[in-house]
A protein has these predicted regions:
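Phosphate-group recognition and catalysis centered on beta-loop-alpha active-site segments
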Residues: 1-235
Protein backbone atom coordinates (compact mmCIF):
# COMPACT_ATOMS: atom_id res chain seq x y z
CA UNK A 1 0.00 0.00 0.00
CA UNK A 2 1.34 3.46 -0.86
CA UNK A 3 2.23 5.66 2.08
CA UNK A 4 1.67 9.37 2.50
CA UNK A 5 3.48 11.31 -0.21
CA UNK A 6 5.59 14.19 1.08
CA UNK A 7 4.77 17.68 -0.14
CA UNK A 8 7.95 19.34 -1.36
CA UNK A 9 8.14 23.02 -2.26
CA UNK A 10 10.44 23.72 -5.22
CA UNK A 11 12.68 26.69 -4.40
CA UNK A 12 10.23 27.18 -1.54
CA UNK A 13 7.10 28.08 -3.46
CA UNK A 14 8.40 29.37 -6.76
CA UNK A 15 4.97 30.16 -8.25
CA UNK A 16 3.89 32.20 -5.23
CA UNK A 17 7.06 34.22 -4.62
CA UNK A 18 10.46 34.40 -6.35
CA UNK A 19 12.23 31.09 -5.79
CA UNK A 20 15.09 30.60 -3.34
CA UNK A 21 14.02 33.63 -1.30
CA UNK A 22 12.74 34.16 2.22
CA UNK A 23 9.22 35.09 0.99
CA UNK A 24 9.17 31.87 -1.03
CA UNK A 25 10.22 29.77 1.97
CA UNK A 26 7.60 31.48 4.12
CA UNK A 27 4.90 30.86 1.50
CA UNK A 28 5.86 27.20 1.31
CA UNK A 29 5.49 26.62 5.03
CA UNK A 30 2.24 28.60 5.10
CA UNK A 31 0.84 26.14 2.56
CA UNK A 32 1.82 23.07 4.54
CA UNK A 33 4.88 21.63 2.84
CA UNK A 34 6.77 18.78 4.47
CA UNK A 35 10.05 19.68 2.79
CA UNK A 36 11.59 22.77 1.18
CA UNK A 37 13.94 22.35 -1.78
CA UNK A 38 16.45 25.08 -2.57
CA UNK A 39 19.52 25.45 -4.76
CA UNK A 40 23.08 26.23 -3.72
CA UNK A 41 25.58 27.65 -6.20
CA UNK A 42 29.05 29.18 -5.73
CA UNK A 43 29.26 32.86 -6.62
CA UNK A 44 32.28 32.06 -8.82
CA UNK A 45 32.03 28.71 -10.56
CA UNK A 46 35.80 28.71 -11.01
CA UNK A 47 36.34 29.01 -7.26
CA UNK A 48 33.74 26.77 -5.60
CA UNK A 49 35.92 26.15 -2.55
CA UNK A 50 36.36 29.84 -1.66
CA UNK A 51 33.66 32.03 -3.22
CA UNK A 52 30.41 32.84 -1.44
CA UNK A 53 27.71 30.18 -1.55
CA UNK A 54 24.43 31.54 -2.87
CA UNK A 55 20.85 30.31 -2.94
CA UNK A 56 20.39 30.36 -6.69
CA UNK A 57 19.52 27.94 -9.48
CA UNK A 58 21.77 29.70 -11.99
CA UNK A 59 23.74 32.90 -12.47
CA UNK A 60 20.78 34.93 -13.78
CA UNK A 61 19.48 35.48 -10.23
CA UNK A 62 20.07 39.17 -9.49
CA UNK A 63 20.30 39.41 -5.70
CA UNK A 64 20.46 35.93 -4.19
CA UNK A 65 20.56 35.08 -0.52
CA UNK A 66 23.73 33.58 0.83
CA UNK A 67 23.61 30.04 2.17
CA UNK A 68 24.19 31.40 5.66
CA UNK A 69 21.23 33.78 5.39
CA UNK A 70 18.97 31.03 4.08
CA UNK A 71 19.89 28.51 6.76
CA UNK A 72 19.56 31.10 9.51
CA UNK A 73 15.98 31.73 8.40
CA UNK A 74 15.14 28.06 7.98
CA UNK A 75 16.16 27.30 11.56
CA UNK A 76 13.36 29.55 12.81
CA UNK A 77 10.57 28.13 14.95
CA UNK A 78 7.99 28.19 12.17
CA UNK A 79 10.12 25.74 10.16
CA UNK A 80 10.46 23.19 12.97
CA UNK A 81 9.70 19.77 11.54
CA UNK A 82 10.10 20.90 7.92
CA UNK A 83 12.77 18.91 6.10
CA UNK A 84 15.24 20.40 3.63
CA UNK A 85 16.34 19.29 0.18
CA UNK A 86 19.60 21.11 -0.54
CA UNK A 87 20.30 20.84 -4.27
CA UNK A 88 23.96 21.32 -5.19
CA UNK A 89 24.19 22.68 -8.73
CA UNK A 90 27.92 22.02 -9.19
CA UNK A 91 30.61 19.86 -7.57
CA UNK A 92 33.45 21.22 -5.46
CA UNK A 93 31.88 22.81 -2.38
CA UNK A 94 30.41 19.79 -0.64
CA UNK A 95 32.47 20.19 2.55
CA UNK A 96 31.42 23.81 2.98
CA UNK A 97 27.73 22.94 2.71
CA UNK A 98 28.07 20.09 5.21
CA UNK A 99 29.88 22.37 7.66
CA UNK A 100 27.14 25.00 7.33
CA UNK A 101 24.42 22.42 7.98
CA UNK A 102 26.29 21.14 11.03
CA UNK A 103 26.71 24.67 12.39
CA UNK A 104 22.93 25.18 12.22
CA UNK A 105 22.05 21.74 13.58
CA UNK A 106 20.30 20.73 10.36
CA UNK A 107 22.02 17.48 9.40
CA UNK A 108 19.19 15.26 10.63
CA UNK A 109 16.55 17.27 8.73
CA UNK A 110 18.41 17.45 5.44
CA UNK A 111 18.62 15.52 2.20
CA UNK A 112 21.30 16.74 -0.23
CA UNK A 113 20.58 16.15 -3.91
CA UNK A 114 22.74 16.61 -6.98
CA UNK A 115 23.23 15.46 -10.54
CA UNK A 116 26.84 14.58 -9.81
CA UNK A 117 27.58 11.10 -8.50
CA UNK A 118 31.11 12.12 -7.49
CA UNK A 119 29.59 14.73 -5.17
CA UNK A 120 27.45 12.05 -3.53
CA UNK A 121 30.54 9.93 -2.90
CA UNK A 122 32.28 12.90 -1.26
CA UNK A 123 29.22 13.74 0.83
CA UNK A 124 28.85 10.16 2.07
CA UNK A 125 32.42 10.22 3.33
CA UNK A 126 32.03 13.66 4.93
CA UNK A 127 28.79 12.99 6.81
CA UNK A 128 27.25 9.49 6.87
CA UNK A 129 24.13 10.78 8.64
CA UNK A 130 23.05 12.83 5.64
CA UNK A 131 20.44 11.45 3.28
CA UNK A 132 21.57 11.71 -0.33
CA UNK A 133 19.56 11.99 -3.54
CA UNK A 134 20.76 11.40 -7.09
CA UNK A 135 19.01 13.72 -9.57
CA UNK A 136 18.19 12.64 -13.12
CA UNK A 137 18.33 13.47 -15.97
CA UNK A 138 21.07 16.04 -16.60
CA UNK A 139 19.26 18.26 -19.11
CA UNK A 140 18.62 22.00 -19.25
CA UNK A 141 15.29 21.93 -21.13
CA UNK A 142 12.38 19.68 -22.08
CA UNK A 143 13.17 18.49 -25.61
CA UNK A 144 9.73 16.93 -26.04
CA UNK A 145 8.19 20.38 -26.52
CA UNK A 146 9.91 21.05 -29.87
CA UNK A 147 8.93 19.42 -33.18
CA UNK A 148 12.60 19.33 -34.15
CA UNK A 149 13.65 17.30 -31.13
CA UNK A 150 10.44 15.46 -30.27
CA UNK A 151 11.21 12.07 -31.85
CA UNK A 152 14.81 11.72 -30.63
CA UNK A 153 13.71 12.93 -27.20
CA UNK A 154 11.04 10.24 -26.93
CA UNK A 155 13.46 7.60 -28.19
CA UNK A 156 15.90 8.60 -25.45
CA UNK A 157 13.08 8.64 -22.92
CA UNK A 158 11.98 5.09 -23.73
CA UNK A 159 15.54 3.84 -23.37
CA UNK A 160 16.04 5.75 -20.11
CA UNK A 161 12.83 4.31 -18.65
CA UNK A 162 14.08 0.79 -19.39
CA UNK A 163 17.56 1.29 -17.99
CA UNK A 164 16.98 3.60 -15.03
CA UNK A 165 15.37 1.12 -12.58
CA UNK A 166 18.43 -1.14 -12.59
CA UNK A 167 20.95 1.69 -12.53
CA UNK A 168 19.22 3.60 -9.73
CA UNK A 169 18.67 0.48 -7.62
CA UNK A 170 22.35 -0.35 -8.03
CA UNK A 171 23.39 3.02 -6.63
CA UNK A 172 21.01 2.60 -3.69
CA UNK A 173 22.32 -0.88 -2.86
CA UNK A 174 25.92 0.33 -3.13
CA UNK A 175 25.18 3.05 -0.57
CA UNK A 176 25.94 5.93 -2.93
CA UNK A 177 22.44 7.38 -2.57
CA UNK A 178 19.32 6.97 -0.47
CA UNK A 179 16.87 8.38 -2.98
CA UNK A 180 16.34 9.09 -6.65
CA UNK A 181 15.18 12.57 -7.63
CA UNK A 182 13.57 11.92 -11.02
CA UNK A 183 11.90 14.12 -13.61
CA UNK A 184 8.25 13.14 -13.86
CA UNK A 185 8.64 11.85 -17.42
CA UNK A 186 10.99 9.13 -16.15
CA UNK A 187 8.66 7.78 -13.47
CA UNK A 188 7.18 4.32 -14.01
CA UNK A 189 5.78 1.65 -11.69
CA UNK A 190 8.87 -0.44 -12.52
CA UNK A 191 11.15 2.35 -11.30
CA UNK A 192 9.25 2.68 -8.04
CA UNK A 193 9.32 -1.09 -7.46
CA UNK A 194 13.06 -1.30 -8.13
CA UNK A 195 13.79 1.51 -5.70
CA UNK A 196 11.54 0.05 -3.00
CA UNK A 197 13.17 -3.36 -3.37
CA UNK A 198 16.58 -1.70 -2.97
CA UNK A 199 15.44 0.26 0.09
CA UNK A 200 15.41 3.64 -1.65
CA UNK A 201 13.00 6.55 -1.99
CA UNK A 202 11.61 8.29 -5.08
CA UNK A 203 11.06 12.05 -5.28
CA UNK A 204 9.54 13.45 -8.47
CA UNK A 205 10.20 16.89 -9.98
CA UNK A 206 8.87 19.37 -10.98
CA UNK A 207 5.11 18.79 -11.05
CA UNK A 208 2.83 21.80 -11.43
CA UNK A 209 -0.38 20.03 -12.45
CA UNK A 210 -2.95 18.96 -9.87
CA UNK A 211 -4.08 15.78 -11.65
CA UNK A 212 -0.53 14.67 -12.20
CA UNK A 213 0.19 15.17 -8.51
CA UNK A 214 -2.82 12.99 -7.67
CA UNK A 215 -1.58 10.22 -9.99
CA UNK A 216 1.87 10.26 -8.40
CA UNK A 217 0.35 10.19 -4.92
CA UNK A 218 -1.74 7.17 -5.93
CA UNK A 219 1.36 5.48 -7.33
CA UNK A 220 3.00 5.88 -3.93
CA UNK A 221 6.10 7.96 -4.65
CA UNK A 222 7.96 9.28 -1.61
CA UNK A 223 7.60 12.94 -2.47
CA UNK A 224 6.33 15.29 -5.15
CA UNK A 225 8.22 18.52 -5.82
CA UNK A 226 6.13 21.46 -7.04
CA UNK A 227 6.43 25.20 -7.53
CA UNK A 228 2.90 25.66 -6.19
CA UNK A 229 2.13 23.82 -2.93
CA UNK A 230 -1.46 25.08 -3.14
CA UNK A 231 -2.01 22.31 -5.70
CA UNK A 232 -1.79 19.66 -3.00
CA UNK A 233 -5.09 20.85 -1.52
CA UNK A 234 -6.75 22.11 -4.71
CA UNK A 235 -10.02 20.73 -5.96
Amino acid sequence: MPGVTLRVGHKGAGHIAPGNTIPSFDAAVEHGVDMIEFDVLPEDHLAPETSRLLLAHDYSHATPLTLEQGLAHLTGARFAGVELDVDLKLPGYERRVVEALRAHGLIERTLISTLYMRSLVVLRELEPRLRLGWSVPRVSRDYTTSKLTLLPAYAWLLQARRRLPGIAAGHIRAGRADALMAHWRLVTPALLRALRDAGGDLYVWTVDDREQIRRLEALGVTGVITNDPRLFDAG
